[in-house]
């Protein structure tokens, strides 16, 4: 399959009004090795005002569950396998700001050198698909991530369960 066919496959999950903006952001993410949205916007020649990109993401104008299912289907079509291996991982993303979505002081279990035990950060739980490419080697394709709330009843295990349920077919 060609890249254009991959994009067309994913666009089925995107409302027609949002498709152009979605493709611009997707291409920006492909051009940018870090994957950050702000870098993706900087990597493209913007055809729309920055608020258009903000609204697409922040207001969830793209159905994330449907898009993640399409991505999973695409990867399984391109790399067919009998055994599907999904992994769940939680990641702390350090933040300088004191307030924002999901930002709070969290315990860092990684015990990295020159890093305090408690960090001002966000916690993301990610569901990914492991794709075997060669004997003994594999790629990991992130399917969907979920920002953990800074407080409340929804812990990492609850979020992990929701992520698994969202791709169960």
Predicted feature descriptions by range:
Residues 1-169:
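Conserved, well-structured functional cores that handle cations and Mg-NTP chemistry
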């Amino acid at each position: 399959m060609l890249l254009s066919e991959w994009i067309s496959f994913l666009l089925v999950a995107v409302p027609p009004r949002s498709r152009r903006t979605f493709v611009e952001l997707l291409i920006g993410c492909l051009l940018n090795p870090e994957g950050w949205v702000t870098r993706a916007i900087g990597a493209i020649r913007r055809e729309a005002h920055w608020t258009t990109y903000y609204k697409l993401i922040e207001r969830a104008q793209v159905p994330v569950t449907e898009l993640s299912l399409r991505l999973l289907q695409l990867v399984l079509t391109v790399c067919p396998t009998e055994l599907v291996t999904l992994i769940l991982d939680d990641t702390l993303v350090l933040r300088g700001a004191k307030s924002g979505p999901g930002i709070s002081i969290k315990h860092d279990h990684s015990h990295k050198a020159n890093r305090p035990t408690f960090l001002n950060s966000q916690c993301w739980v990610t569901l990914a698909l492991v794709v075997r490419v060669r004997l003994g080697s594999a790629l990991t394709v992130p399917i969907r991530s979920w920002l953990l709330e800074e407080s409340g009843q929804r812990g990492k295990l609850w979020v992990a369960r929701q992520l698994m349920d969202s791709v169960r077919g």
